[in-house]
């Protein structure tokens, strides 16, 4: 059994979440898009699926993010759609939907400066957390 904070459900270890984010950091999106595109993105989603299969204990939060292009409400909606697209792809690969949850943060918590095109590209991403 897992912790009280996690309603008795087991959590994914910090090491597993770190590995998930290493793959997830390579899941980026074009501006105004939530489509899963590119061979590398698909390979990384398959690696994430394999990691979850190897570690049946614990659930995952998929966090969606956007760059500062567009207004705040639009960016929150877009970030949710990005996280949802990743959820749907993982489910298609065989991950049970009950192990996944989606949150959209819009342009909050940028990894890079939104003043540069490279920074905005990096900020259009998903990240993962163990569900507590």
Please identify what each model-predicted range represents.
Residues 1-59:
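Periplasmic peptidoglycan-binding/tethering modules of Gram-negative envelope proteins
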Residues 39, 63-132:
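Periplasmic OmpA-like peptidoglycan-binding domain that tethers envelope proteins to the cell wall
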